[in-house]
Amino acid sequence: MPTIKQLIRKKRQPNLNVTKSPALRGCPQRRGTCTRVYTITPKKPNSALRKVARVRLTSGIEITAYIPGIGHNLQEHSSVLVRGGRVKDLPGVRYHIIRGTLDAVGVKDRQQGRSKYGVKIKNK
């Protein structure tokens, strides 16, 4: 607990809100171009080959974004839409690629949770 004298010398600093997705610069999504598409392994105790892409955004910032869903068609120079949202077991991956927009096609044969993977309703 500071004394009154200490508060006069240096006032209390307000807690500034630190953004979890600074590369988006306050926008809900940003467009970018894939510079590299590759796989990385997650932290312990998980084990897999997670698909990620290095993306250069229109703002000029280069980020690492996760490619959700099973299978993808992304390659170098693909145009993608990126949203915020980290992947808990991949350090440094704080963004997700939005499936079903621009060059990222939706997940094939997806029945449930379709809106998250860019899949239109399948008519019988």
From Swiss-Prot:
Q: What is its main location?
A: plastid
Q: Which UniProt keywords apply?
A: Plastid, Ribonucleoprotein, Ribosomal protein, RNA-binding, rRNA-binding
> PANTHER family in the record, alphabetically?
30S RIBOSOMAL PROTEIN S12 FAMILY MEMBER
Q: What is this protein called?
A: Small ribosomal subunit protein uS12cz/uS12cy
Kindly list the biological process annotations in GO that this record carries: translation
Its annotated compartments are: Plastid
**Function field:** With S4 and S5 plays an important role in translational accuracy. Located at the interface of the 30S and 50S subunits.
Species, as recorded: Epifagus virginiana (Beechdrops)
Transmembrane stretches, start-end: none
